Amino acid sequence: MNRFCSIFRKNVFFISILLLWMTLIPSFFCGTAHARIVKIGIYENAPKVFTDASGKPAGIFVDVIEYVSKKQGWQIRYVTGTWAEGLDRVTSGEIDLMPDVAPSPERKKHYSYHQVPVLSSWFQVYAPKGSGIKSILDLNGKKIAVLDRSIQKEAFEELKQGFEMNSTLITVPDYTTLFKITRDKEVDAAITNRFYGLQYAKDFDLEDTAVIFHPSNLFFAAAVGTRQDLLNAIDTHLASLKKDPDSVYYQSLKTWTAEKVKFTLPLWIQMLGLLIMVFLIAALAGSAILRKQVTVRTRQLENVNHTLQTSEKKYRELVTLANSIILRWSVDGRILFLNDFGLQFFGYTEPEIIGKQMTDTIVPEMESTGRNLNKIIRDIPDRFKAYEQHINENIRRNGDRVWIDWRNRLIVDDKGLPKEILSIGSDITPLKQAEQKINQLNRDLQQHAQNLEKQVQDRTAELTVAMEKAQAADHLKSAFLATMSHELRTPLNSIIGFTGILLQGLAGPLNEEQQKQLGMVQNSSRHLLALINDVLDISKIEAGQLSLSFSCFDLRDSIEKTVHLVQPLAQKKALELLVEIDETVSEVTTDQRRLEQIIINLLNNAVKFTEQGHIRVVCRPEKDHYLLAVEDTGIGIHPDEISGLFQPFHQIDTGLSRKREGTGLGLSICKKLIQMMNGRIDVRSQEGKGSTFTLCLPKNCEVSHGK
Amino acid sequence: MGNELLIIEDNAQNFYMMKFLLEKNGFSIIGTENGRDGIKAALEHTPRAILLDIQLPEMDGYEVAAALKTHKEMADIPIIAVTSYAMAGDRENILAAGATGYIEKPINPETFVDEIRQYLP
């Protein structure tokens, strides 16, 4: 407030300076003869008249006199002093005018006034807070401070006399001292005009009492009978100033005091008005602030509400539009909520299903696997943990069974007891079907594998039986062949024996024809014997009944012996029989009889299939074995025939037209025998040019044979 | 010691053939058709040698050879197996049973007598 005042005072000061300057300028130019110097007394009684912070005179009276001076072309001189000094200076003529003077009968003797009052004022008693002064009578016996020689003093003394009160009046030179001693409790109360009191009581922690008295008008005063021109000029201007609400006068009042100039209104109404105003303003301000706060709060709430709505909408969309079944159900198995997807999935509308038991609608009592789902649903709230994820069969309205993978969440009430269950489900029927299909396929595969295994077992058993049968048959065959061989030999023994006896002439001389025919019988019987021997050999070999008897002998001797045996046949066909045995060829350990059988066989074949040229027997050692080759210049072998050459009963030119003798078993026996000796037989041939059969014979077949 | 040979052979033709051939070469022949008679004849006549067929009715050649060898007086009489058995081990088996020699049927009439002589003491 003070700060506010001081700013205004400063402004007023500048305005005053400006006004002063403006009033001086015309007088300066118009000549000093017209420039009337007017001396004005100044004392401290803000806001009516006082010295502002910068030491310049200010106040309502100052504003008025400045205005009048400006209009009149006066030059103002201020003379500062106390109230009493001011009054003395007026009477002594030291100053022209003293402001703020209220006329009284006594004063009328010393001072002259103008007619139109500058201000009207009341006197009021101010006291420290809680003084209990409520009426004029409460001032009885109290010490009351009052301005020296002031009209208040005069007025209060009149009141004192009138009410017969015994109050002590303490006079002070200025208002500041007045309030100060009241604050310091040197006096009980102070009397001042309301202009000053209103403005400064607060600063001194004083309150205005209900004691208000003596309304008075305030004027500029001059020494009695003097300065009438000044007083008249003041009246003239004041009259016009008071008519114009925008005049300097009202602006000054507005500037210096909050008090309205409705002096005619009773004070309590003004006070009330002021209070109401203050209340109204405060109420308005408060309501504005409240309104503002409400608006802000409302906006905040709206925002929150909007956010909530958006959020809720989002969640609702999420729940309703989700491609999962979202289900809420009570602990007693009733459906509380099912989202759009779920409704569509199960084939119900909302009114059809909400509130219904799950087992009457979407859950079959018995799963196709045989589980009792009714029991499980009753079980879920109690043993929730076990069912947080649960796959079970459900049923659609049309009766279709579906498999759902459920994720369950238990919702509890305030007491922590199970209230409802939130279930989110995904249809896994295709998955389940695929799984079942895979399981079925697996079972089929297992069955198939078992079948296969059984087939293999059966087949193995069959094969074992067959093999046993074959082996038995083999034995039987061998036994049969052995028996046959024996049975054939017995009559053959007689045939060969008697033929020989007859041919030897032991039974008497034979003629030439008899000799010739008996010779034929002998040949045939020998061939028959060879056939029987070969068949016996092959059957023995195949039955594994042929065992070799090894001995160490000279290979050269064996070769030469066999060559010697075949020599007559070769000679008969005029074939050259060449023998080339390396010098180093000597001992060999193998079955001599069987080796010789092989060599004879090869030599016989060579002679048999060669019509001209030669037969050559070559033998040489090579590392741990001997190579023995029988080479001829005979008919040779067609390449196609070579592969089957060593098979039993094979003979080139098979059929009725064959011209060679032989069993067709020879080479197959040779091959089997040489293999039993851990050797090998190979053939090279060019059809029409000849063949070479080569034996590869280990020097000691026992080493690797093991027999 | 005479030149008597005992032939134990159940086949009449074979017996006759061998008897003819051997008699032509100066031997005298006693013959039986079975082993039992053969043993009896051997003990009775103590021949220079015994020609023994293997496949015989009732007692086979192995049994006969074994039985003969139990008699002390038979110890020095060669037993020559003449047989059409030609399976592996036949020769070894008969020699083990007590035979001195082994001739395979069919015989070679040109060499048969010489082969027999080879076994005679």
Each model region followed by its residue ranges:
Chain B
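Charged docking surfaces used in two-component/phosphorelay signaling
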Residues: 16-24
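Active-site beta3 strand of CheY-like receiver
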Residues: 45-51, 56
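C-terminal output helix
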Residues: 107-116
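The feature encodes the CheY-like receiver
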Residues: 57, 66, 75, 87, ...
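Conserved acidic carboxylate
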Residues: 9
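Short hydrophobic/Thr-rich beta-strand motif most characteristic of the beta2 strand and flanking loop
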Residues: 26-33, 41, 103
